[in-house]
Amino acid sequence: MKNLKILLVASILGAIAISYAVADDDGYSKNYKNKNSKYQVSPVKNSLYKEECASCHFGYQAGLLPKRSWEKLMEPKELENHFGDDASVDEKTRLTLLSYLTKNAADSKGNRSRLSKKLDSKISRYSTPIAISETRYFKREHDEIPRRLIVQEDVKSIANCVACHTTAQKGYYGERDIKIPNYGRWDD
């Protein structure tokens, strides 16, 4: 009888331990290969976008904003004052970039990224953010980070994703890959 009680307690404790491990599974071991990871968007593969946009700043994945945001950002007058810089391009280039961005936007039919869908669901249909950092989802995910860690020389801005998200270039924004300069690993 005593052995049966020990076996029963061990089984219960084992089941509890397994449930914690399953609950903590965020797809990390599959993070770059699993397109359905809740932390991943499709990485930038368009060479023109890399040349024209990602040569000046981090190449934000198209799946981080809805079509209407990319359409607004790519308007000629917006490009003339692109966050304080003149990012004007010729019309053919502008239309090619716009096509790439809207076809891969968070709300595009072909985009199957869970993160893109989540980002899009948190943006009001009456809102057209032109910066990812303006979105409600982004603000909620970054609200606990002290300002001093954001404005420091090695980060400079909340818009500098790659400063802290070590796998952002690959489109992966999981917590396990966050390392804030002069602070270390960040974990909510």
Set out the residue ranges of the language-model regions.
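Sequence context surrounding c-type heme c attachment/ligation sites in exported
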Residues: V22-A54, G59-L95, S99, A105-A106, ...
